[in-house]
Amino acid sequence: MSSYPRNYPFYNWVPKWLGILILVLMFIPILTVGGVYSVNSTEMMSGLGIISEHVTFTNFATSIGMAAFCPFLYRLVVIRREKMMCLAGFSMMYGLSYICAETDSIFLLALCSVLMGFLRMVLMMVNLFTLILYAGRIEAYLKIKPGLEPVDGEGWDKLDIERSIAQPGIYLFFMILGQLGTSLTAWLAYEYEWQYVYYYMMGMLLVCILVIFVTMPYHRFQNKRFPINFRQFGNATLFCIPLVCFTYVMVYGKVLDWWDDPTIRMAAITAVLTGALFFYMESTHRSPYYQVGVLKLRTIRMGVLFYFLLMFLNSSAMFVNVFAGIGMKLDNWQNASLGNWTMLGYFIGGMITIFLSMKKV
């Protein structure tokens, strides 16, 4: 970090409080912009004359794109070029948002959703690690750098305590901002037309690009070799294809009468073949895309299970929204307003978890 300006990633004239505020506010478009918005799904379906399965499918496509990012985490955060990555990411999300606002093709909408899910995770992690460095002067990526693991039990215990304190705070931060973004898009869809959600988010992206241009200087890449190559994006594509095909079968199966529809049969065959090819490549390559072997660890399996339950029980999840809309006859704006109360629960639960972690419970 010695070669970087004192106020990295900003110019020296930017006050620290303003830099922290900019990095925090940039999370709102990062967490909110997507291929489709579930809070304006009713208006979108009536405006385009589409069925709810289309919105569900594209929502899952966004999640698949986010999952495809995971192996790129360390390679991207060590690049340490906030301005370049944010400008590229926000610009691509702007173009994809415009396509989603104008297109009536479900295939194109799903493709854009996968790409936007991947870009969302890229921008989220890059901005998070930069915020931690700028606000706390902590190089968070060193905590996940291979070769820097603790060498004794005391070191592992200290690392576990640090993670158990930091992770609830990070989850609390993201979930509150995510709920605020959901409320914002629900209000826009309620007050205006559903297309205005896309246009408003595109405006937010342009504001972010302008702020980055004004407040952040250009930094050269420090290493001679770029840590990412195109072959890894091929692996990510092969990871996404079977999941998207499987999602297509599960979402559209009932509507299209399952195996009587040729697209369902084709999607199922494609999912099986590409899934088998993916696992074959993962088992034979010296540096696999996903370290499937980590699932042998009990702590990893328990973590995946608890995170799944967390997302399943989250009040902003799709299942709860559907229940509130059909069972309680609430519109999307009322549903989002009701969901705002979950932020209080997020805060209470996060504070309790952090307190217990500090007490080494």
Residue ranges, per PLM feature:
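Helix-loop-helix hairpins in multi-pass membrane proteins, especially solute transporters
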Residues: V78-R231
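Central cavity-lining transmembrane alpha-helices of secondary-active solute carriers
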Residues: F57-R75, M124-L128, N340-T353
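Glycine/proline-centered helix-kink
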Residues: S38, F174-W187, L243, M318, ...
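Interfacial helix-cap and linker-helix signal at transmembrane-aqueous boundaries
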Residues: M44-M45, N59, L76-V78, S183-E193, ...
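12-transmembrane solute porter fold
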Residues: W17-I30, S38-V39, P71, Y289-V361
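Hydrophobic transmembrane-helix bundles of small-molecule transporters
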Residues: Y190-L305
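Extracellular/periplasmic helix-loop-helix junction of adjacent transmembrane segments
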Residues: S38-F69
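Cytosolic juxtamembrane N-terminal segment immediately preceding the first transmembrane helix
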Residues: M1-V33, V39-T42, S46
